[in-house]
């Protein structure tokens, strides 16, 4: 009876180790690698009565952070908060409202982690592949969510100035939960 119980426990131990799928391990590794590079972006409203906005960004160089343009569009006194809680002043370096991107320079900080862009044609990305999002939803976090790449295609983005027209680009669509504050988050595949 004791031998049977011991065998059952050993079997449960061996089988229990297989309960974590390789995709879950890869997802956890990608999140851990991304965390040091992801920052909370915030500032105060440019105009009285305007909204203070919180978003996300990520280091792409030693002192350069990428975020969405709409996160910083109406803000002044920009700051970024690192995952470890330290806060640094930031300033606009370059913006492209048409593709909703902004590059910030962070003063006095050296990136604790950097994320790089892969040179892959969007149309070659397989629909259904696992993706991870790391950001600051509602200013909290950093928090991670995951989903799949659910689509790749053009999206016409109207620009604030109608005389400029609209810019059409190739966009990635995901079913990973996106909430207020996640704008500017990196969308990562399971290889990072």
Please tell me what each predicted stretch does.
Residues 14, 28, 76-77, 192:
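Proteins with a high burden of low-complexity, intrinsically disordered sequence enriched in S/T/G/P/A and R
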Residues 20-23, 27, 138, 167, ...:
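Alpha-helix initiation/capping motif
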Residues 28, 38, 77-78, 184:
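Short, acidic/polar N-cap/turn motifs at the starts of alpha helices
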Residues 1-38, 42-45, 50-52:
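N-terminal targeting leaders that route proteins to membranes or the secretory/organellar pathways
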Residues 19-21, 47-54, 59-143, 171, ...:
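Conserved active-site neighborhood of the chymotrypsin/trypsin-like protease fold
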Residues 34-48, 106-118, 143-191:
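Active-site region of chymotrypsin-like
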């Amino acid at each position: 009876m004791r031998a049977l119980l011991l065998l059952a426990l050993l079997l449960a131990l061996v089988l229990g180790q297989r309960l974590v799928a390789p995709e879950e391990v890869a997802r956890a590794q990608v999140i851990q690698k991304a965390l040091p590079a992801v920052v909370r972006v915030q500032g105060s409203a440019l105009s009285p009565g305007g909204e203070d906005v919180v978003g996300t960004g990520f280091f792409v160089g030693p002192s350069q952070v990428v975020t969405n343009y709409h996160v910083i569009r109406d803000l002044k006194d920009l700051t970024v908060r690192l995952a470890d809680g330290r806060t640094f002043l930031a300033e606009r370096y370059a913006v492209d409202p048409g593709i909703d991107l902004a590059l910030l320079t962070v003063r006095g900080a050296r990136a604790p982690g950097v994320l790089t862009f892969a040179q892959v044609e969007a149309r070659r990305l397989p629909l259904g592949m696992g993706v991870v999002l790391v950001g600051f939803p509602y200013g909290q976090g950093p928090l991670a969510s995951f989903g799949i790449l659910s689509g790749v295609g053009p999206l016409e983005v109207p620009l604030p100035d109608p005389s400029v027209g609209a810019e059409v680009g190739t966009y990635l669509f995901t079913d990973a939960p996106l909430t207020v504050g996640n704008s500017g988050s990196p969308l990562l595949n399971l290889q990072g």
